[in-house]
Swiss-Prot record:
One term under GO cellular component: cytoplasm
Catalysed transformations (reactions): [amino-group carrier protein]-C-terminal-N-(1-carboxy-5-oxopentan-1-yl)-L-glutamine + phosphate + NADP(+) = [amino-group carrier protein]-C-terminal-N-(1-carboxy-5-phosphooxy-5-oxopentan-1-yl)-L-glutamine + NADPH + H(+); [amino-group carrier protein]-C-terminal-gamma-(L-glutamyl-5-semialdehyde)-L-glutamate + phosphate + NADP(+) = [amino-group carrier protein]-C-terminal-gamma-(5-phospho-L-glutamyl)-L-glutamate + NADPH + H(+)
Keywords for this protein: Amino-acid biosynthesis, Arginine biosynthesis, Cytoplasm, Lysine biosynthesis, NADP, Oxidoreductase
Main location: cytoplasm
UniProt organism field: Ignicoccus hospitalis (strain KIN4/I / DSM 18386 / JCM 14125)
Protein's UniProt name: Putative [LysW]-L-2-aminoadipate/[LysW]-L-glutamate phosphate reductase
The EC number(s) this enzyme carries: 1.2.1.103, 1.2.1.106
Gene that produces this protein: lysY
Amino acid sequence: MTYEVAIVGASGYTGGELLRVLAVHPDVNVKVVTSREYANKPVYYAHPHLRGIYPASLKFKRLDDPDQLSDVVGDVDLVFLALPHKVSLHYVPKALEVGYKVVDLSADYRLKRVEDYKTWYGYEHPYPDLLEKAVYGLPELYGDKIRGAQLVANPGCNATSSILAVLPPAAERIIDLDRIVVDVKVGSSEAGAKPYRGGHHPEREGTARPYDAEGHRHVAELEQVIRDYTGRDVKVGFTPHAVSMIRGSLASAYSWLTKDLAPLDVQRIYAKYYAGKKFVKIVRGAPMPYPDVKNVYGSNYAEVGFALDKRVGRLAMFAAIDNLMKGAAGTAVQNMNLMLGMDEDEGLKNLVPVRP
């Protein structure tokens, strides 16, 4: 069976990655793509690397308003919303009303608490009922719920790397939940296709700088997942850094052990949570003892690892992902697969990492 999908907001980096991945998916056809900037132009006008991959007849359609959604998109099985935050907000209820399954790649439905949107995004969420309905789309932790979902909220890239690193030790309470600090190094593609000072790659090349050091909004997702698994509220110190790579999100997290453990004990905890998870690799030992974004470049894989600093009783936790893949489009396709009843690695398993 071939499923048909639409990508609403397909001209950005995430839209381009969705198109790249879905081009090799054996059971999915991209029927509709939308973009106001590139309306009526073939997809390769926005994504030149896809010239000859998609037919010239697949052209961007213009979509200006949620009320136009069904007329523009037509009959499809699932819609990817790759729209900016606050724009996607009003497309989701319309898409659900029409009957589409939805993977929303914005932040508009990731958080369960209405008050968190006021705190982190500065607006009152108008659809609290849909926040309850939305499933947080990290398949490694919420796969069973995603399978039956109509609306999946794709996680943020820095949230994904941080959660994969921190969640197993936090859930098992082997670390002090009141003293967790996360440091993320992220590539310039996280800033999106439209350049601005600070996000534009020439401004980031050859340097590294912190930003949102008093609290990046992705930390709300990490705190929410820890709360789901431990039953208690936590506050995590979180600082991302803009670095000169283009792709990649490397989370380095730190906390203090609550019990005396050996490295093998910690490794078993990670294995407990990620055994059988097709896209998570636990990294230990030679030749590279810790996660490296270069090892997951262009793929949906995540590398996860740790270091146990016995001298001070500290656990360092690491995860490396490609921010455009496992941090966005790759996980979105993984979610789509689960929602449509396919194997979760379909269309993704053959996208092996690119190196060097």
